[in-house]
């Protein structure tokens, strides 16, 4: 009971206890519980085998009310069952009791012996919380050198990959476990450190953190630091130094010696080398006493730290080799050469493999490609430089190369970049197996062949690279492999064979001195690229073998499942192997229970694994083998015990083996021979027994020696083989057996007749003879210690000669009813010297002594009938009891009421103890159990008969007929009375309802729907359906009818273009489209152009051949356009599409712009918007420049050597591989005149003493040699409305190119007191250049006559009146200042010419004194001011003055 309670506690959160908290061993019942997925509680009660008496029923008490105590169990809810079996299953229904997760139920149970209830079991608590998580699986323990261990495990199927775990560990000899809590990852690994060196530990893992602790994993053991680390040596040893070299590989060899199994891997700069690396390859060979692994670099171009890592049971050991490349391993990248006026510019970027800090760059250049490099000119530059300009006047070919260097040395020199006259642009194409595409799907490890084809001049070389990078220009230089190429008719081609494990980009590169070009193809690998690794078979039993493996390194898309293949012949084709599929996990390690039940016993089997994803199945792993078991029990009996009973007999007890195979019997091995070892138990003496008991008594027939030490062990067996033996138990026999009856069992019959059974006692003087006389003593008491024994004469004593079992019968009248008795038995011996020895007392309880209620059914327990709506079912039941019982009937556990559902019951009482009941039913349609129940005051009894109907009891339901096309669809639902498993349906159909059913057409189907081919359109059809189960055919349905629909013919549709061939049209050409076809009923027609809204045809023509046709509006397009026709009727919706192919370019280029190079007039730049509809793969553009035509790849375009000072016409068209497209309208372009590009730069302009001084510098872009400068001067117009003067009014002053400043004055024709405008130009040997902007200057001057010296000023009220004696100005500036203050107020006055007086308003303080002065304005310049005079205040008014405009502002003057 203790072990059972522990199991229940672990599995279901269940505990078993009595009111005192102890397990109740007095109950005659075992009790166990379980919970199904629907939360139903299932309770199994079993009578303990050593309790005797007739079982008459069971009772289950249960409650979820925590307020009720365990002692009040009789007030709990309960279920009672009548049964004479030794076990019974109770079910507490979850729906009825509304059981939910988290409920806690307590249960107890009792058994009825002879209708007397026993003491209850202990209390079991059932918590309906979640079930316990399954156990993880420890796969591997990797011992590390620092007394730590890396543990790999696989999580159970019912937990997530990321979960909380507890790791329990202890030393083997220790009692106490230690724990480590951790959270798992997808790799399923955990590190346990802090262990003691050279000690053996055992570990287990289980899920924690939830409501219920998980099931512990398998135990794993390991010993820390029991193995030495592997010895690792490398060649070269620690450092390797070499010059960079692209055509020589680099190899490093690692030799590993280990006392245990070891594995080797390489790392470069700390990163593990992948098997699909495009630069590194690793070759490893395993020898008898060492492992040799070599890593090979494709070229000697990369400095790196190489690490050889060896792993064995002791941990990891490694050796590093530092590879130093003395200089950059690749040339500078992205080198470009640009031709400019008077030279070339070379630019570059740093090398991809600098192998240190770049300290300088060396640029080589020459005009003769064939010169040796030593004759090329050389330019040394700092490491920070990224370009250089080389001045050179020649227009011949130019060649350059660039090299980088570090402080360790120079690097790889670049290929030649060139600017040559006779070159042809490079084009390159690639195809795989003759197919050219941007993306192709390939299989992993498939041998692929790519052909690279190139054109160009000079002849290009061809290289190939397989990389993860999509951009070919970004692929590392040393990854490219140059191919052996062949040339024919200007076409260079090369072929490269390779394979890939995962998706890659394969690049073809064509390269010559003029540049390079690339062709790229993406290779998509969808299937798994490699096989699962590290296959292991961890355990094997009779049912299954546990296989674990690691996921593939290159899954390429999520792994959905794994396929495990098994065979006992590793040479057999894999297609014939047994295959088992298991779902994939997200973890690194996966597992599967491989069924072994059908495999041959004791046979070696081979296992391999394949990964599978959505794209297909990957390659097969390496093989691993295991040997199946012999078929016998796969575990030994446990808990073996040896006891000596009261008769000094040896009794052996054990537990049944926990075996996955059947145990049919046991072999009990025993010996007293000390020369035979425990492992040699097969040579011990043994006895055999069957599997109906786990107890064996060594009686005198075995012949054990008295007072002797024996060893015993037990193994299970079955028809295949013997199982492993148990542990060895030693025992010592007694001096002799005592003649005492043992193993008493009692049985009380209904009339209180008592049977006492036990093994016969052997005559101690003659062991071959069994004693036949016994004395029986009874005591009617509950207290055996104070019992008053009374000898009873038995009614009879019988001995079974075969089994030596004694059966003593005692008359029921000699005992009291309903009384507890104790019994003991004593053998009567002929030899009194042995004495009188009684058995152990045994208790039993008598019954009431009355006739038990019982029922019997006439006939067999199974009645089989074919379904019939008109045949009657009849069953007769006889009930007996005291008094005569009342008989009722149940159908499928539900009470039957007389006269309902076709049932009729007739009861006849024969006498006081017997009743006969006959039940009938008016049809035979339903299978089930029919039960007869008899009840009276003394008890109840029941008997059942199974009614098995041989076919469905009703026809399929909800039969629906639907006329559709040229058939009638028939659907239905399953019969509600299937009477077994429905296997098929029979469909009958006919044109004539009155035909005999045998004349109807019929067919069979397993589905719930089918169809019947019609006899013709608009025809009435009659249909019936019948279900057939695994027992036979059922009731056929009634007749249903349906009229078939109109005639149906499949729609066939096509699209025709009447004015073009093969659906190829010119750009913007009008195309006539017609849709036509056949089909019934006649469909409605629709058309659609590209993504426009679908339209229906207004007119549809038909002819006698049932052909329909419709014409769509004309369509034109500049690109490929899809034309769609759709025909739709009540049955079909058919759509077809065809593409009108536009091959030539769809339109002319637009938005054309042009410009000339700022520095060189003869270079023309043309740009335009690329066309939208190329309609081809190879698009070029035609330029028509007057009478000149050229092809270009696209805008912008640079055209040198354009003639100067002329008008040229420009037209542009697009052209693809199918032809030329539309040209643009002509554009007239005036070319530059060749003069300076910019005007002279005026540095100074000022006038003084009737002269103007002009300084300038040469134009920024003279566009040649300056010949002279021209200065233009004219008077500034006085009126704003006057038009600008014409060029002939400008005075020209021409000076030589060596003049940069001039002085122009009155002597040169300029006039004093005038304002002038000035501009200038420069002229080179070809033409005059652009003008500067227009500047202004004047030659105005003032003398003493220009100073105002005769004026007066007075103030009247708030107005100032001024009178000028000699007015020479029309604009005046008047300055008014307060005495003693330097702040002056300025007024600007405009007056008419010759006017002598004017006034302006001004607020002044009459208590203060003010002064006033004046100046005049001439041609925008102010004259010298007059002298200051006092401002006079007059209080009397004066005549009204003339008002003139005045502007006043405060100005700041310095003090006098």
Swiss-Prot record:
| Cytoplasm found in the keyword field | no
Q: List the disulfide bonds.
A: 254-308, 877-932
| UniProt-listed Gene3D superfamilies | Immunoglobulins
List of glycosylated residues: 64, 146, 164, 198, 225, 471, 497, 517, 658, 691-692, 893, 898, 969, 1091, 1120, 1133, 1151, 1207, 1268, 1277, 1298, 1350, 1357, 1382
Region span, Disordered: 1419-1456
- Does the record carry Repeat as a key word? yes
User: Residue span of the signal peptide, if any?
Assistant: 1-16
UniProt keywords, alphabetically: Disulfide bond, Glycoprotein, Immunoglobulin domain, Repeat, Secreted, Signal
- Domain Fibronectin type-III positions: 24-128, 132-227, 328-426, 531-631, 636-736, 737-846, 955-1050, 1148-1234, 1236-1343, 1347-1438
Q: Which InterPro entries match?
A: FN3_dom, FN3_sf, Ig-like_dom, Ig-like_dom_sf, Ig-like_fold, Striated_Muscle_Regulatory
Q: Can you quote a single GO CC term?
A: extracellular region
Could you tell me where this protein is found in the cell? Secreted
**Compositional bias segments (type: Low complexity):** 1434-1445
Outline the extent of the Ig-like domain. 236-322, 841-948
Q: What is this protein called?
A: Ig-like and fibronectin type-III domain-containing protein C27B7.7
Q: Which organism is it from?
A: Caenorhabditis elegans
